Regions:
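Transmembrane beta-barrel domains of Gram-negative outer membranes and organellar outer membranes
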Residues: 20-161, 166-170, 205-207, 215, ...
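A generic structural motif
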Residues: 75-77, 225, 248-250
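Outer-membrane beta-barrel "beta-signal"
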Residues: 108-115, 197-199, 247-262
Length: 262
């Protein structure tokens, strides 16, 4: 419990100092890239994903795997989460002995803080702006779970810091969203330094159809690959289903359960 409190405090400190993606990282956002959209206050989310190997750092995975994560939104501005990504030794090429039967998981924290809401202060042109961090610390024998050495090829596989902005526009056909972000990390095996941009479209014709709440189509460049896909919301926004073609050819998909605690 003490280690958890230390790690959680470190995460909040990092959020106040630094500006990872998103459905595939079990948090709010687009497919691979972050956005500045937020969940309602008190929203608890459970996310499960299938991830192709091209979505994963090469130093940890040479195979496709699964991940699951939890997140909670406070005060409509702060989202914190915890994500686990499965290691499967039987899928490592040439693995023998103990390595072949190893079944473990990588664990990391994430956090996002919305510093500006869309249209805040009565300014209709104002975009929403979010600062975020994913996998900010790693474990070591001397420092517990507060070691900040997350660069290179070691632990801290999913490390990223980012700032994202989002603006929505209503049209006669549906809602259009424009998303810009800048991401930074110190990884050698998962290099995402640079700008990211995305466009979303939620057609009005697919809103509020039986149990279907909406379908949001997404095209994005996440600073590494160009991705397309969609996120469908059903049953009064309790469930979301995600399908993605990373680099327009590699498949990721996921399912999310959302619970309002307020």
């Amino acid at each position: 419990m003490r280690k958890f409190i230390i790690a959680f405090s470190a995460l909040l400190l990092l959020l106040s100092q630094r500006a990872g993606a998103q459905f595939v990282d079990s948090s709010g956002g687009l497919l691979q890239m972050p956005s500045a959209e937020k969940q309602d206050d008190g929203t608890f989310m459970i996310t499960n994903n299938y991830l192709n190997r091209h979505s994963l750092p090469t130093s940890g995975w040479s195979y496709s795997t699964f991940s699951y994560g939890f997140s909670l939104t406070f005060w409509s501005r702060l989202e914190v989460g915890y994500v686990c990504t499965i290691f499967d030794g039987s899928k490592i090429p040439g693995a023998t002995g103990r390595a072949r039967i190893m079944f473990n998981q990588d664990r990391h924290f994430l956090g996002r803080f919305q510093i500006l809401k869309e249209g805040e202060f009565g300014l209709k042109w104002m975009p929403s702006v979010v600062l975020g961090v994913s996998d900010p610390t790693t474990a070591s024998s001397s420092n517990g779970y507060v070691d900040a050495e997350v660069g290179g090829y070691g632990n801290g596989y999913f490390n990223r810091n980012y700032i994202a902005a989002t603006k929505h526009f209503s049209t006669s056909w549906g809602e259009l969203g424009a998303h810009l972000a800048y991401q930074y990390n110190r990884r050698n095996d998962y290099h995402i330094n640079g700008p990211a941009a995305g466009v979303t479209f939620t057609p009005g014709i697919l809103c509020d159809r039986a149990i279907l709440d909406e379908v949001r189509f997404i095209a994005e460049y996440d600073a590494r690959t160009f991705n397309i896909g969609f996120i469908a919301s059903v049953w009064e926004n309790r469930f979301e289903a995600m399908f993605e073609l990373q680099a327009c050819k590699w498949v990721n998909f996921g399912l999310r359960y959302k619970l309002g605690l307020k």
